[in-house]
């Protein structure tokens, strides 16, 4: 009799990826976020599918179709708020997952890391387009402001913006295409996730010590499946608490006002998970400079494998680098706060200082500190 999990072409892949996968024996809860992100993606696709059944991508009916989902569709309010807050959970886990990668030096798996950065861009694009769909005030003006940034690209900029809009302003054509892209991108993301895992399973997982763990592996199932279930439990408790008690906590009240091209909201700002990048964009008084800083604030992640100058992989045994890491986290929290504030004194100055500190820490302080630690250890 053949052993199906090990011989069947499809089941064999699943078996090697989630059951018999050799995993380091010492990976902590920081390694839970991969599975949580996978669950978030599945949840978003599922809730999104049910929302798409009732949503209409037309400027005249989009806003009222969302209202209809919340009021008239069975458990429509639940599906809508699970989708909206699920996106917030998605980004929380993404940022923690990336932070873990930086702290423990997981970026030395360059293929896995670079696909991860592309995934981040894809998820950010999807979330941005999803925010436009309810066609509230912040949807409309957010779409106008962010797409308009592309006009800063020399020579082709203005033409490119009109091409994306499908006209001379954000209108019906824009909404329709954003819905189409918002629907297709999660499936592209799913394919990219598979590539991300394929590259990861070529090398095996990193671990908190940063030392090769080939000599000490345990099967993924049951050890890490049960550990993942605990993470999933915590995630669902947090998500459902948000959805049931404060569904609008992370949203913008302006988005409950239907889109009006003749009335600009006093403070145009994106969802909370983009505020750090928005603060960096706003801190540069030049349009093209701001756009470049915005893009580079994410693209800088691809430089981590190049900038790694320590003889140790992980930060576990490097106290000075740990201080810088937490300084970077604090800096990003300050940027997030500034991104939600109006453009006036003292927020402008704080934003500019935090933006400079962000790039300075990653590009200069972290690599030079790592070199100093090598010297201190006589390496």
From Swiss-Prot:
Keywords: Electron transport, Heme, Iron, Membrane, Metal-binding, Mitochondrion, Mitochondrion inner membrane, Respiratory chain, Transmembrane, Transmembrane helix, Transport, Ubiquinone. InterPro entries: Cyt_b/b6_C, Cyt_b/b6_C_sf, Cyt_b/b6_N, Cytb/b6-like_sf, Cytochrome_b, Cytochrome_b_C_euk/bac, Cytochrome_b_N_euk/bac, Di-haem_cyt_TM. It comes from the Eukaryota. Gene3D superfamilies: Cytochrome Bc1 Complex, Chain C. Component of the ubiquinol-cytochrome c reductase complex (complex III or cytochrome b-c1 complex) that is part of the mitochondrial respiratory chain. The b-c1 complex mediates electron transfer from ubiquinol to cytochrome c. Contributes to the generation of a proton gradient across the mitochondrial membrane that is then used for ATP synthesis. The gene is MT-CYB. One of its GO terms (cellular component) is mitochondrial inner membrane. GO terms for biological process: mitochondrial electron transport, ubiquinol to cytochrome c. A ubiquinone binds at residue 201. The cytochrome bc1 complex contains 11 subunits: 3 respiratory subunits (MT-CYB, CYC1 and UQCRFS1), 2 core proteins (UQCRC1 and UQCRC2) and 6 low-molecular weight proteins (UQCRH/QCR6, UQCRB/QCR7, UQCRQ/QCR8, UQCR10/QCR9, UQCR11/QCR10 and a cleavage product of UQCRFS1). This cytochrome bc1 complex then forms a dimer. Heme b b566 binds at residues 97, 196. The lineage of its organism: Eukaryota, Metazoa, Chordata, Craniata, Vertebrata. It is found in: Mitochondrion inner membrane. Binds 2 heme b groups non-covalently. The keyword Transmembrane applies. Belongs to the cytochrome b family. The chain crosses the membrane at residues 33-53, 77-98, 113-133, 178-198, 226-246, 288-308, 320-340, 347-367. Heme b b562 binds at residues 83, 182. Its cofactor is heme b. It is a multi-pass membrane protein. SUPFAM superfamilies: a domain/subunit of cytochrome bc1 complex (Ubiquinol-cytochrome c reductase), Transmembrane di-heme cytochromes. This is Cytochrome b. Heme 1 (or BL or b562) is low-potential and absorbs at about 562 nm, and heme 2 (or BH or b566) is high-potential and absorbs at about 566 nm. One of its GO terms (molecular function) is metal ion binding.
